[in-house]
């Protein structure tokens, strides 16, 4: 590793953010104590943590660094004529009321049901301008890596750790290794960040990033919008990574400017000057590297029961016989048995029962626009739910007439929430049904007991909706 002109060693962005937040250094016997800039909470993983605080008589260490919303268990259907929300059960209603009480008692800013800013936590946080470059961000949710799109070190934590951050604003953490994923070239027509991340996970495998933070680099990544970068970082965990991030640039700053929690005036100028120093230094080294060519990719879709089991929509369902490793062969056989798919058969043409467009992976305005491109002037042939990721997304989409396009196509336009991604709120599929979903996980039963999930981009999902089967969105857009 060559030294910089000032004599210092080149550092990655992960090094820079980590070093700036170490309260106590890591030793062989103990993890580092890491300061946390932003703690996002929602109604499902936080109640137990607040209960522990009450039992121990503790207050929040930095309530202004904590921001709350509701998303997992809330209904995506509107209030009834009686003004009540149609919760799926009493437990869901109790989670919401408990969240309201916890935030009121501990002084946490909450944007709950009926609030104009409410949304899926990883859509809502960035929209508020709360997520900023160089921050450490945590949330009791697996897909917290979404916020890495801003050049933040963001990762999910467990319920006990939620309590630790509420009480101390710190966490015990071991320094992660680094993995550079460089994407050359540019994505072709009909492809998006979702296709890119599915291709990356298929290449790495679901454990390929274990113990690492992924930094996404290269011209194809730089060309992505902030929405695309959030999709990319969101699914880093599905490759086993602790987090994923993209260094901030003018695209980042333009997206953040003017948002409620973003710095203003002179403070904004000072912040941008700091943020410009965050990208990895020339000559910085990574523990591992992976390189892909974006121009060689095709629209992707999963066929199995983990996000790493992905192929091009033009491809064939893999044959386990081709697997030399016995364990990998058994895993593939089990996945195909659950999914009911035939080895060697084209995935295109596979009948689809339900389509879900939404989630913290693909519930942003850009995703709504992509889906509308395919739905406009066409009719869906299967049940289709389009669920905006936040009230802001919903409002913006409706201002553009996207809701009308969705409804005229025969699809359902819903209220914001996690919805069918995790199927906690009554939005689910039935046993044996196939769902093309823009969410992030295709585990057995993820969208309902016995349900079969195929992960894809909004374009590919919308193409499945209007054809009733897995289809190449490029052909649908071309009218073929």
Swiss-Prot record:
Note on cofactor: Binds 1 [4Fe-4S] cluster per subunit.
Q: List the disulfide bonds.
A: none
Q: Which GO terms describe its biological process?
A: L-leucine biosynthetic process
Which GO-annotated molecular functions does the record name? 3-isopropylmalate dehydratase activity; 4 iron, 4 sulfur cluster binding; metal ion binding
EC annotation from Swiss-Prot or TrEMBL:
4.2.1.33
Q: Does the keyword 4Fe-4S apply?
A: yes
- What UniProt keywords are attached to this protein's entry? 4Fe-4S, Amino-acid biosynthesis, Branched-chain amino acid biosynthesis, Iron, Iron-sulfur, Leucine biosynthesis, Lyase, Metal-binding
The pathway entry for this protein reads as: Amino-acid biosynthesis; L-leucine biosynthesis; L-leucine from 3-methyl-2-oxobutanoate: step 2/4
- What cofactors are annotated for this protein? [4Fe-4S] cluster
Tell me which SUPFAM superfamilies the record gives: Aconitase iron-sulfur domain
Annotated catalysed reactions: (2R,3S)-3-isopropylmalate = (2S)-2-isopropylmalate
Question: Sorted alphabetically, which PROSITE patterns does this protein's record hold?
Answer: ACONITASE_1, ACONITASE_2
The record ties this protein, via Gene3D superfamilies, to: Aconitase, domain 3
Lyase recorded as keyword? yes
Q: Where does [4Fe-4S] cluster bind?
A: 360, 418, 421
| Function, in words | Catalyzes the isomerization between 2-isopropylmalate and 3-isopropylmalate, via the formation of 2-isopropylmaleate.
List, alphabetically, the HAMAP family matched.
LeuC_type1
Q: How does the record describe its quaternary structure? A: Heterodimer of LeuC and LeuD.
**Family assignment from sequence similarity:** Belongs to the aconitase/IPM isomerase family. LeuC type 1 subfamily.
- Its protein name is 3-isopropylmalate dehydratase large subunit
Lineage, broadest ranks: Bacteria, Pseudomonadati, Myxococcota, Myxococcia, Myxococcales
